[in-house]
Each structure stands twice: as structure tokens, then as C-alpha cells.
A protein has these predicted regions:
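Eukaryotic scaffold repeat domains enriched in small/polar residues
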Residues: 1-300
């Protein structure tokens, strides 16, 4: 992943080496840092950016808990200030449900967590001014948390439930292959030494139905995707809705009061990836799983 930083610099995420590094406009590498901090036994912070604000401060998610501890149902949005590297908790959000597998002895323990596909979770994003926007999965409403801590909550949005059948399961598996399958994290203890590794996980486009049935599935899809909420230049938050398998992509758009002001439809297998001064950048896939980047005029 690549993130824009002030001064025409970018932030590169290197999962293979478990580090992040900045790259300047002169193509010289800058400071590096680990993707995980803390002790897995008491609480691990995975410092993989989900957003960067206009000051270049990085926002990551903390899942809390630790080896041998019950996993909490909420995570924290952490702001890492560039320069000082100070960390502040700026919001809390609901985590997706997981299955946990543990093996080994006290000094040789292996803990693996797998997210339950399509389980409800909150989504969040960050505006350029550092405001946090969250979509709450309980009743599907959007709230904004300003840099001073004040909160504005919008009205709940009513949507029709989408049942999960075999087509929805197949589409989920295919989407994991399209986007790299998300990030898998493995923590291991070998003779008292702790190691953390990262990789791309998830199902594949050719997963058999029998493989899909091995997962734990909810009865219905949640109202929206738990992926990053993107804020456009008009300070509107774009939340991607869940739909029936094979249907066009839908985005609900919310203003700074948390009220839905528009719903936009994109072609099937398309998703918003970024915004420019007056355009929307959309990634799409064709029948051969080739990626294309499109620029649309910004809807008003």
C-alpha cells in the first residue's frame, strides 16, 4: 500500500519485512518503522495505516487483547503524530467476529485468528482536518468526531437485509482474491521468543463450495463493508453498501451532519479508491480479473 504524505513524499507498507518506510520526492528512502508494537502477551498494536490526514499524521487500528486474553469486541483508532511518534486514541469501533485457534504449550504457543466472513463491523475513515468518520453497524448511522472531541451523529439509515446464499459466499471468496485477501497476522512463541509475521490471507477465486462451507457464516450481510471510508473534497463520507451477489456497486454518501445526502451506483466489480480535486478514481475488474483505473467527474 502507498499513502500520500506532505512535501510530495509517500509512505510505503512492506508486509514481507513487517515495516513501513517513507520515500521522498528525490526517491531517497527516509525513516523506517515496524508494523507492530507492544507485547503480544499483553496487547499488540498493528501499525498498518488505514488513513493519513493533511498533516501527515497516520491513523491505525488497535485490536487490544493479548495472548491468553479474551479478544475484545471493540478496537481503537490510534493517531500516530509524525515527528514525535506520540500515540493518541481518537475513537472506538466494533470489530468483526472471529474464530480463534490456539495450539502448543506455554513456551511454544501458536495463536491464529480468522475473521468470520461478512460479520458486522464498524467502518471508519479520516478527513484531511483529522476528523474521524464512523459508520456504526448496529443501526447503520454515521457519526463524526472532530479534532476537539465533539461528536455529531446522523439519523439511522434503513436498508433491506441481504441474505447470504452460495452466490454471496462465492462472490466473497472472489473478492478476497481480487483485493489480496486482506492481511493475516500470526504471532508465535518459540522457546520464549516472540515473533510476528504478516501476509495476505483469505479465500481464492477458485474456492470450492465445500471449502466455503467450512467457514462460519451469518444469515445476512451487514449493511455496509467494513473497509475504509473515504472522504471526498466536499467533506462527504462515502460508505460502500452490501448488495446481492452480481448487483452493481452502491455507495451511500453522508454530509458532515451524518445525514445521507446521496446514493451512487457504479458498475459491478467497481470500487472507489480515491478522490482528486474534481474527480473520483474508481478501480474495476473485467472478466479476466484485469484491473482498470477510471476517473469520473465528481458528482455534486
Amino acid at each position: 500500500a502507498v499513502w500520500a504524505l506532505p512535501g510530495d513524499s509517500i509512505l510505503l507498507i512492506d508486509l514481507g519485512n513487517g515495516r513501513m518506510v517513507s520515500l521522498g520526492p528525490d526517491l531517497e528512502f527516509g525513516p523506517t518503522g515496524p508494523l507492530s508494537t507492544g507485547d503480544p502477551r499483553s496487547g499488540l498494536t498493528i501499525a498498518i495505516p488505514q488513513a493519513v490526514d493533511g498533516n501527515g499524521d497516520v491513523y491505525v487500528r488497535s485490536m487490544g487483547g493479548g495472548m491468553g486474553a479474551a479478544r475484545p469486541d471493540s478496537g481503537a483508532v490510534l493517531r500516530v503524530t509524525r515527528g514525535t511518534l506520540s500515540v493518541d486514541t481518537v475513537a472506538m469501533f466494533k470489530l468483526p467476529e472471529v474464530t480463534v485457534t490456539e495450539s502448543g504449550s506455554a513456551n511454544d504457543r501458536n495463536v491464529s485468528m480468522s475473521v468470520i466472513p461478512l460479520s458486522p463491523q464498524d467502518a471508519w475513515g479520516v478527513a484531511p482536518d483529522g476528523s474521524i468518520v464512523l459508520a456504526r453497524s448496529g443501526d447503520y448511522h454515521v457519526e463524526w468526531i472532530a479534532p476537539d472531541g465533539s461528536i455529531v451523529s446522523g439519523s439511522p439509515v434503513r436498508v433491506e437485509s441481504v441474505s447470504i446464499g452460495i452466490d454471496e459466499k462465492r462472490e466473497w471468496a472472489r473478492s478476497q482474491a481480487e483485493t489480496g485477501g486482506g492481511i493475516s497476522i500470526q504471532v508465535m512463541m518459540d522457546n520464549g521468543a516472540l515473533t510476528t509475521s504478516f501476509g495476505r490471507g483469505g479465500g481464492g477465486a477458485n474456492a470450492e463450495d465445500e471449502e466455503l462451507d467450512q467457514y462460519t457464516w451469518p444469515d445476512v450481510k451487514p449493511p455496509f463493508y467494513g473497509t475504509r471510508i473515504i472522504v471526498d473534497p466536499q467533506d462527504r463520507a462515502w460508505v460502500r453498501r452490501h448488495v446481492d451477489a452480481g448487483q452493481p456497486t452502491l455507495y451511500d454518501v453522508f454530509d458532515r451532519q451524518g445525514e445521507r445526502v446521496a446514493t451512487y451506483e457504479l458498475p459491478f466489480r467497481s470500487r472507489v479508491v480515491s478522490f482528486g480535486a474534481s474527480g473520483v478514481y474508481v478501480a474495476s475488474l473485467d472478466d479476466f480479473d484485469l484491473n482498470y483505473l477510471h476517473r469520473y467527474t465528481m458528482p455534486m
